[in-house]
UniProtKB/Swiss-Prot annotation:
Protein name from the UniProt record: Hemagglutinin glycoprotein
Glycosylation sites: 149, 422, 587
Gene symbol of the encoding locus: H
Mutagenesis or variant effect for residue 547 to A: No effect on fusion activity
Subunit organization: Binds canine SLAMF1 at the cell surface.
Outcome recorded upon mutating residue 491 to A: Loss of fusion activity
Transmembrane segments: 38-58
Reported impact of residue 543 to A: No effect on fusion activity
UniProt effect for mutating residue 549 to A: No effect on fusion activity
Single GO MF annotation: host cell surface receptor binding
Membrane topology designation: Single-pass type II membrane protein
Pfam families: HN
Keywords in alphabetical order: Glycoprotein, Hemagglutinin, Host cell membrane, Host membrane, Host-virus interaction, Membrane, Signal-anchor, Transmembrane, Transmembrane helix, Viral attachment to host cell, Viral envelope protein, Virion, Virus entry into host cell
């Protein structure tokens, strides 16, 4: 039997396996040369891979661009949605509320007013009393049953309407920022700062007179709804010899216009100089409805006679229109009409206002009817003699134990009636300072703010609410208190002490700003600093906050007169100030008039 190796060798001898070695060599020899079609396939495969990579890159770029565009569109849609949300919440919602108020509240009221107007006009055709019409069309063809004083009436009404039409564009620009809030926001997290600046009055008549070395004294200014008025005594220089008398009474009126950088400019449009020997040593002033009105007397205390026992002194009435040479420019002496119990009135520096063609002022008055009531108030309050005023032996301005009441002077300026000065009186908080009462218009109907200035640093001024209608009342509002010992309607002004602050040489009048909520301003001439200064104090009694700002002076002296009048302009406080002082070095008297601006801001 053959061994295993021999069997294998014998098997391969008869088969192709025997030549396997040779075949293997031949196969290796042919594999070193690759066929061309294989290289072509590889090339196509490489090109395909590159094409796929290029397509992938292009698609990736397109997707990135699409995502960016989608993000941009989404952001725009979000901004539009936010704008729509803002319009709905901040604009449409208040607008709908206003529309609801107009439809639900004001529209019925207006319809009722229209109804009353129609009823009133229809009743005119069958009047049962004498009527006074204010419509121009009644001048053309009035009903025969109507009795109207037509002397210069129609002409005056036409002129007034023409003047109002010409003045309205100027007033609208001035009133655009005249009712804003001068104070920083209520929730001010940082400190509140104030910045002040002084401006000259370059086109004011009084400034031109002062610049010519003429002396101006006792200036009284009133500002109302974009119109200002002044009255003062002018003492011409002896060298010029332009006037025949030593003192000339001057009135001027004009607009408050916007000037450079929207600052207010007091531009004189009309003025009047009273002739010599006129009874115009002491004058009041009232401004409103494009008109200035003034009451002038020779002596401050005016006696009132109600029978033939005495000769009643007349009061000089001066009216001045906003433009030159109009029927509003008028001078006339009138006899006041007062209640029989009134004995005297005291006229000094009084500022009033004109509303509904009626000029109104407040003055101290002496009336026998209210004496016992006022004395009873003092006696009950002074039982313990804890108040400084309890030791007073004489009361201003009438002297002795004669306690003054509140007098109201009203002067209708309607062209259809003759000038008549009516005097009424009432009782109110005790008056300690008889020199000066001012009356400011209030946003409340038929009322105003009556102010009495402080005095000697010991008597604080006070602010009362005074009625303007038929029912004349004076109610305490600020800087008064009801003593514990008294009962009923008894109020006293705040009296600090009998020791005067020696650093405060003089105090100004109290000015109530024409804002919705009451704010008031007062100024003092202060010498507590190295430089003399006029310091302004601004108060908000509702929020119980106050601000101060000093204006340093370049001169030093002893002042004898300080008067301010303030208004709001573009949310800033502006004040016209006039002060007169005797210089320490030159030993001469100097008058200064200018505008000051105070801007309050919040440092958050």
């Amino acid at each position: 039997m053959l061994p295993y190796q021999d069997k294998v060798g014998a098997f391969y001898k008869d088969n192709a396996r025997a030549n396997s070695t040779k075949l293997s060599l031949v196969t290796e020899g042919h594999g070193g040369r690759r066929p061309p079609y294989l290289l072509f396939v590889l090339l196509i495969l490489l090109v395909g891979i590159l094409a796929l990579l290029a397509i992938t890159g292009v698609r990736f770029h397109q997707v990135s661009t699409s995502n960016m565009e989608f993000s941009r569109l989404l952001k725009e849609d979000m901004e539009k949605s936010e704008a729509v949300h803002h319009q709905v919440i901040d604009v449409l919602t208040p607008l709908f509320k206003i529309i609801g108020d107009e439809i639900g509240l004001r529209l019925p009221q207006k319809l009722n007013e229209i109804k009353q107007f129609i009823l009133q006009k229809t009743n005119f055709f069958n009047p049962n009393r004498e009527f006074d019409f204010r419509d121009l069309h009644w001048c053309i063809n009035p009903p025969s049953t109507v009795k109207v004083n037509f002397t210069n009436y129609c002409e005056s009404i036409g002129i007034r309407k023409a003047i109002a039409s010409a003045a309205n564009p100027i007033l609208l620009s001035a009133l655009s920022g005249g009712r804003g809030d001068i104070f920083p926001p209520h929730r001010c997290s940082g400190a509140t700062t104030s910045v002040g600046k002084v401006f000259p009055l370059s086109v004011s008549l009084s400034m031109s007179l002062i610049s010519r070395t003429s002396e101006v004294i006792n200036m009284l200014t009133a500002i109302s709804d974009g119109v200002y008025g002044k009255t003062y005594l002018l003492v011409p220089d002896d060298i010029e010899r332009e006037f025949d008398t030593r003192e000339i009474r001057v009135f001027e009126i004009g607009f408050i216009k916007r000037w450079l950088n929207d600052m207010p400019l007091l531009q004189t449009t009309n003025y009047m100089v009273l002739p010599k020997n006129s009874k115009a040593k002491v004058c009041t002033i009232a401004v409103g409805e494009l008109t200035l009105a003034s009451l002038c007397v020779e002596e401050s205390t005016v006696l009132l006679y109600h029978d033939s026992s005495g000769s009643q002194d007349g009061i000089l009435v001066v009216t001045l229109g906003i433009f030159w040479a109009t029927p509003m420019d008028h001078i006339e002496e009138v006899i006041p009409v007062a209640h029989p119990s009134m004995k005297k009135i005291h006229i000094t520096n009084h500022r009033g206002f004109i509303k509904d063609s009626i000029a109104t002022w407040m003055v101290p008055a002496l009336a026998s009817e209210k004496q016992e009531e006022q004395k009873g108030c003092l006696e009950s309050a002074c039982q313990r003699k804890t108040y400084p005023m309890c030791n007073q032996a004489s009361w201003e301005p009438f002297g002795g134990r004669q306690l003054p009441s509140y007098g109201r002077l009203t002067l209708p300026l309607d062209a259809s009636v003759d000038l008549q000065l009516n005097i009424s009186f009432t009782y109110g908080p005790v008056i300690l300072n008889g020199d000066g009462m001012d009356y400011y218009e209030s946003p409340l109907l038929n009322s105003g703010w009556l102010t009495i200035p402080p005095k000697d640093g010991t008597i604080s001024g006070l602010i009362n609410k005074a009625g303007r209608g038929d029912q004349f009342t004076v109610l305490p509002h600020v800087l008064t208190f009801a003593p514990r010992e008294s009962s009923g309607n008894c109020y006293l002004p705040i009296q600090t002490s009998q020791i005067r602050d020696r650093d405060v040489l003089i105090e100004s009048n109290i000015v109530v700003l024409p804002t919705q909520s009451i704010r008031y301003v007062i100024a003092t001439y202060d010498i507590s600093r190295s430089d003399h200064a006029i310091v302004y104090y601004v108060y908000d009694p509702i929020r119980t906050i106050s601000y101060t700002h000093p204006f340093r002076l370049t001169t030093k002296g002893r002042p004898d007169f300080l008067r301010i009048e303030c208004f709001v302009w573009d949310d800033n406080l502006w004040c016209h100030q006039f002060y007169r002082f005797e210089a320490d070095i030159a030993n001469s008297t100097t008058s200064v008039e200018n505008l000051v601006r105070i801007r309050f801001s919040c440092n958050r």
